[in-house]
Amino acid sequence: MADLASHPVGQPLGGGGVSFGTDGIRGRVGTVMTPALALQVGYWSGQVLPGDAPVLLGMDSRSSGPMLVAALEAGLTAAGREVWTLGLCPTPAVARLVNQFQAAGGLMVSASHNPPEDNGIKLFGPSGAKLSRDQQQAIEAGLRGEVRPALTSCGPTQRRTELLESYTALLENSLEGRRLDGRRIVLDLCWGSATSCAESLFRRLGAEVIALHSQPDGAAINVGCGSTHLEPLRQAVMEHGAEMGFAFDGDADRVLAVDGQGRLVDGDHILYLWGSALADADALPQQRLVATVMSNLGFERAWTARGGQLERTAVGDQHVHAAMAELGAVLGGEQSGHIISADHGMSGDGVLTALQLAALLQPGETLSDRVDQSFRSFPQRLRNVRVPDRDRRKGWQQCDGLTTAIAAAEAAMGDEGRVLVRASGTEPLLRVMVEASSQEQVDHWTDHLSELADQLLNV
């Protein structure tokens, strides 16, 4: 970390313009994500996290991970914190182990579903939940660099990779004795965090596993595979005659599935199926689920027809978590596959979700059977419009031409459709989503609004 040597005491170490997005701090390695920034994040996290218990530190398989972990460890120990490094693990392992071992908090080095050139830092508090906005702002204030860390104390470090077994034991115990004997299941491990435990755990529970992208590879993580690229999973399920398949993202905090017919089982369907099982067991208070504004109208109408309540939040699992805590809900999540079960920690967990979905099935029953009994999604399409100018992207609602066109689209579709436009919290993208009762309307309005946004915002 020679780049730190030229920084005199009292001057910033870098990161003055960095702030928390929807999922921690994330960006391109070497520009946004640097060792200097990671050292600062580690130091100020060490100052903000309460108590004097250890801080856990994990990473996904990205090539830049060890470099950033080393810098975070240096910053944390400089703040006087004891650090336990977990090595390669899923993000939810950090959250669950923080809670199990009563740690002060945890940091995960990962950029989730982003490309290999990116990396990021996710932070968790003592309960394993993501940091509060007040805690994030306290760290951001430190990153503005008005005072350089004194770096006068040094906490101890321990390598505790064996703790991953404690995490997998929690997952196995969540099934309460249910097994997966005889189930042929494809797992797309995405060259990422899921390679650390998912395949071995499914096999231990009796499943016949076909594993794709099953070794950690920092240069290939998320490339043409995983939860954002389902075709390899779908093809393998069909070729091997599997009952189902699961695709994880880079840090395994979310999962999408396909059934034996190759049909997508997204987060909405997972919530419906898992929620229905809980409701039938009288284990879903007020039959309430929490989802986001991205969830499908077909899901909402089917769940309401079943007698349930669906509460919607802004996009981001932290918003789902907050609403669940406020409402006393036990299950929530996102269409993208972040599913949170309050009975099993308050962090999205792709491996846990996959296990629970597979274990719902009765002998002789397939996932396709359950999907057939769920709901038909409204046609929905999402287009990403690249808008490099951050102010234009974040302030798209000030563009009268675009807001007028959105209002016209919503009026034309009436109660049978909707438009959702939002700026990504992690990428320079404006996301335009249209949902309607007919594919023709969806395609027309998605293309029209996306092209208009490109014309008006990129001038």
From Swiss-Prot:
How many and how are cofactors bound here?
Binds 1 Mg(2+) ion per subunit.
PTM notes: Activated by phosphorylation.
NCBIfam families, per the entry: glmM
Modification sites for Phosphoserine: S112
Catalytic activity entry: alpha-D-glucosamine 1-phosphate = D-glucosamine 6-phosphate
Task: Give the lineage.
Answer: Bacteria, Bacillati, Cyanobacteriota, Cyanophyceae, Synechococcales
Q: Kindly state one GO CC term assigned in the UniProt record.
A: cytosol
Residue sites binding Mg(2+) per the record: S112, D249, D251, D253
Q: Does the keyword Phosphoprotein apply?
A: yes
Gene3D superfamilies linked to this entry: Alpha-D-Glucose-1,6-Bisphosphate, subunit A, domain 3, Alpha-D-phosphohexomutase, C-terminal domain
Which EC number(s) does UniProt give?
5.4.2.10
**Cofactors required:** Mg(2+)
Q: Which organism is it from?
A: Synechococcus sp. (strain RCC307)
Q: What is this protein's function?
A: Catalyzes the conversion of glucosamine-6-phosphate to glucosamine-1-phosphate.
* Encoding gene, per UniProt annotation: glmM
- Report the family membership: Belongs to the phosphohexose mutase family.
Q: Which residues form the active site?
A: S112
Name the HAMAP family on file: GlmM_B
Annotated Pfam families: PGM_PMM_I, PGM_PMM_II, PGM_PMM_III, PGM_PMM_IV
State the name under which the record lists this protein.
Phosphoglucosamine mutase
Q: Which UniProt keywords apply?
A: Isomerase, Magnesium, Metal-binding, Phosphoprotein
GO annotation (BP), single: carbohydrate metabolic process
Q: Which GO terms describe its molecular function?
A: magnesium ion binding; phosphoglucosamine mutase activity; phosphomannomutase activity
